[in-house]
From Swiss-Prot:
Domain of life: Bacteria
Disulfide bridges in this chain: none
Function statement: May protect the nitrogenase Fe-Mo protein from oxidative damage.
Keywords in alphabetical order: Nitrogen fixation
Protein name, per record: Nitrogenase-stabilizing/protective protein NifW
Biological classification of the source: Bacteria, Pseudomonadati, Pseudomonadota, Gammaproteobacteria, Pseudomonadales
Transmembrane segments: none
Keyword Cell membrane: no
A single BP term in Gene Ontology: nitrogen fixation
Family to which the UniProt record says this protein belongs: Belongs to the NifW family.
Subunit note: Homotrimer; associates with NifD.
């Protein structure tokens, strides 16, 4: 597992600190979430999409104080990461492509093609 990062200094604006994060590992380290690098390497896009989905479901939390938002953001990131520790991308079906059951076909009569 990666070493847990020290809790960030929240004296400054949380939003400014978040703007500096560019990778799944950056987010996990910033929020002090211990992680297995191989899990993140395989599932980074899925983890971040699930995290985004959880943030959207959480509703309007932007008005909360930074320390409270930090705790909420961390909790949701832990949840998103853990979804992929015990499961896999195909099972979790984060992206639309995993929701497609069968190839979609459409019949177009030849007379419609000719005008």
């Amino acid at each position: 597992m990666s070493e847990q990062a020290a809790e960030p200094n929240l004296d400054g604006p949380l939003d400014e600190a978040l703007e500096e994060l560019v990778s799944a590992e950056d987010f996990l380290n910033f929020f002090g979430v211990p992680f297995v690098p191989s899990v993140v390497q395989v599932n980074r896009l899925h983890i971040m999409q699930r995290y985004h989905d959880y943030l959207c479901q959480a509703g309007d939390i932007e008005h909360l104080q930074d320390a409270v938002r930090y705790a909420v953001y961390r909790k949701l990131l832990v949840r998103a990461y853990e979804d992929f520790v015990a499961s896999d991308a195909q099972t979790e079906k984060v992206f639309k492509v995993f929701h497609m059951h069968e190839p979609q076909t459409t019949f177009v009569p030849i007379d419609q093609l000719l005008g």
